[in-house]
Amino acid sequence: MADQATQHHLVLIIARDFASRLATPVFLVDARGSVIYFNESAERVLGRRFMEGSGMDAEEWSTVFAPSDDDGNPVGLADLPLGVAIREQHPDHRMLRITSIDGTERRIEVTAFPLFAHEDECLGAIAVFWEAPDAER
């Protein structure tokens, strides 16, 4: 059957369960950067329901919310905390501005880190984020 659900490693299943229980926005991707899950709190910040964003690849989620720095310069996948966590396999933290799907501009603080099953087996990454106070421009 071609449309079978993707089987995920137990670590990712547990991470998804953990994220589903948090009030803090959480975004979870696999090792290729495809969206596995984001919780209801993330839905409110992003302006998109998980069912509409499930399976987005890294290229899509890294651009659809128009991430930029405080000066308005676009921030590409390679410089986004989740991109760093996937590509370089180490934690990263950054302040960003995004535009949610409903057009609301938000300033968020993001911390992302890779998820390992074993020291040399990165399964994906998780980003925890929250709305941050607006900086003086």
Give the location of each predicted region.
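PAS-family sensory domains
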Residues: 2, 121-132
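Sensory modules in modular signal-transduction proteins
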Residues: 6-34, 40
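Sensory-domain boundary/capping and coupling elements
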Residues: 13, 136-137
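Sensory helix hotspots in PAS and closely related PAS-like folds
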Residues: 43-44
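Terminal output helix/cap of sensory domains in signal transduction proteins
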Residues: 53-100
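Beta-strand residues that line the small-molecule/cofactor-binding core
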Residues: 77, 105-107, 124
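PAS/PAC sensory module
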Residues: 93-97, 107-110, 126
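PAS-family sensory domains and close relatives that share small-molecule sensor folds
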Residues: 100-102, 111-117, 128-131
